[in-house]
Curated annotation (Swiss-Prot):
Modified residues (N6-carboxylysine): 203
Source superkingdom: Bacteria
Gene Ontology MF terms: magnesium ion binding; monooxygenase activity; ribulose-bisphosphate carboxylase activity
Organism: Cereibacter sphaeroides (strain ATCC 17025 / ATH 2.4.3) (Rhodobacter sphaeroides)
Protein name: Ribulose bisphosphate carboxylase large chain 1
Enzyme Commission numbers on file: 4.1.1.39
């Protein structure tokens, strides 16, 4: 019998000094995961000569209780329960040398309601492990008992729609451009023009905080003046994502309180502030009836490459637990990374009460969200009115469609850019509701609407043929991944 991956127990274990991870009990090919286990799927690339099962056991060990040698203090713990267990290893289809490694963790290993603690175990150490050329966390499954220790989004999609009194169609937004350099007064003018033209939201970008050209307080004052004026003139509830990201939590709370005092309904933070800060701001938003918008700034440094890092679907799961109301999830048709099925998988993580296994969309596990509120996905980055049929078909109603350059760059002005997007959306939703095939008839529907809307006509003439047809880096490993054609 081959014993190289068989656990060594008893006194022989503690005489051994250094054992293989599989021999220390971190591999169990017969293990059946429990409903209460936290499950993780890693993509691993072992060094030449390293047994994939041993590599998988090492991942389980180094993300739970192991160190490089046997330690007698294991005997002071319930080590059989505390050890994570790699229980399945499969070759990655079409990628020699890479393996999918499934690992189960007993729920007792994790602090309740703490993304910081969860990530310290799952990704804290294993990604630097020498026997692995590369490792990537592809997906996770959280038991209901663990999900219930989190409060989730402070507002959720249903309550947000009730506050806006907007139902049955996507929300519209735009990012103020240029990102940097505008004075507070000019910034507020851009916000007013976009909202007056028909958008629901305008937003700060990820790197606009409090720079010499525009102090944060000036921005907040001019922006909220614009929001209130546009709301009064249109009769619609409007908002602007005020970015409160700062160098300390104390300063972030100070900015959040000022935004609230001005009547803002929403604040924004960047992913780079960290999970503890995100959970803290989420709790503040919950206590103060504020919507929390999350910009995923920095995620591409570790989510884009298929062989090493963390899939964005995992980040989306962590952020739903941590408690954000909006999350940038990609566009599939815009300028940023993401093929259609993969991006749809991110949206499913945000919006569904229960995720089923869907390998085409990168979902390897079922996930019961235990009535945790839903996150509103945001599609932003290189999109324009000419793609409205694709965006509506891909993502449905519960999404914020943000046209930054596609609003601010309109040849007839900002307000005209907003109007073009609003008319394009209304025309496409109407056509869909009438039973028309918007995938096929989309361009025709837009051109018909443009006959009665000069701003839309100008938008289609300016950007109608603009596409970003590049091969996605992060794609499904199980099915062909089609591109979206205009």
């Amino acid at each position: 019998m081959d014993t190289k991956n068989t656990e060594i127990k008893g006194k022989e274990r503690y005489k051994a000094g250094v054992l293989k991870y599989a021999q220390m009990g971190y591999w169990d090919g017969d293990y059946q995961p429990k409903d209460t286990d936290v499950l993780a799927l890693f993509r691993i690339t072992p060094q030449e000569g390293v047994d994939p099962i041993e590599a998988a056991a090492a991942v389980a060990g180094e993300s739970s209780t192991a160190t490089w040698t046997v330690v007698w203090t294991d005997r002071l713990t319930a080590c059989d329960s505390y050890r994570a267990k790699a229980y399945k290893v499969e070759p990655v289809p079409g990628t020699p040398g890479q393996y999918f490694c499934y690992v189960a963790y007993d729920l007792i290993l994790f602090e309740e309601g703490s993304i910081a603690n969860l990530t310290a175990s799952i990704i804290g150490n294993v990604f630097s492990f020498k026997p692995l050329k590369a490792a990537r966390l592809e997906d996770m499954r959280f038991p209901v008992a663990y999900v219930k220790t989190y409060k989730g989004p402070p507002t959720g999609i249903i309550v947000e729609r009730e506050r806006l009194d907007k139902f049955g169609k996507p929300l519209l937004g735009a990012t103020t451009k240029p990102k940097l350099g505008l004075s507070g007064k000019n910034y507020g003018r851009v916000v007013y023009e976009g909202l007056k033209g028909g958008l629901d939201f305008m937003k700060d970008d990820e790197n606009i905080n409090s720079q010499p050209f525009m102090h944060w307080r000036d921005r907040f004052l001019y922006v909220m003046e614009a929001v209130n004026l546009a709301s009064a003139q249109t009769g619609e509830v409007k908002g602007h994502y005020l970015n409160i990201t700062a160098g300390t939590m104390e300063e972030m709370y100070r900015r959040a309180e000022f935004a609230k005092s001005l009547g803002s309904v929403i604040v924004m933070v960047d992913l780079i502030i960290g999970y503890t800060a995100i959970q803290s701001i989420s709790e503040w938003c919950r206590q103060n009836d504020m919507i929390l918008h999350m910009h995923r700034a920095g995620h591409g440094t570790y989510t884009r490459q298929k062989n090493h890092g963390i899939s964005f679907r995992v980040i989306a799961k962590w952020l739903r637990l941590a408690g954000v109301d909006h999350l940038h999830c990609g566009t599939a048709v815009g300028k940023l990374e993401g093929d259609p099925p993969t991006v749809q998988g991110y949206y499913n993580v945000c919006r569904e009460p229960f995720n089923t296994v869907d390998l085409q969309r990168g979902l390897f596990f079922e996930q019961d969200w235990a009535d945790l509120k839903k996150v509103m996905p945001v599609a932003s980055g290189g999109i324009h009115a000419g793609q409205m049929h694709q965006l509506l078909s891909l993502f449905g109603d519960d999404v914020v469609l943000q046209f930054g350059g596609g609003t601010i760059g309109h040849p007839m002005g900002i307000q005209a850019g907003a109007t073009a997007n609003r008319v394009a959306l209304e025309a496409m939703v109407l056509a869909r509701n009438e039973g028309r095939n918007i995938d096929v008839e989309g361009p025709e529907i837009l051109r018909a609407a443009a006959k009665w809307c000069k701003p839309l006509e100008a938008a289609l003439d300016t950007w109608g043929n603009i596409t970003f047809n590049y091969t996605s880096t992060d794609t499904s490993d199980f099915v062909p991944t089609p591109s979206v054609s205009m």
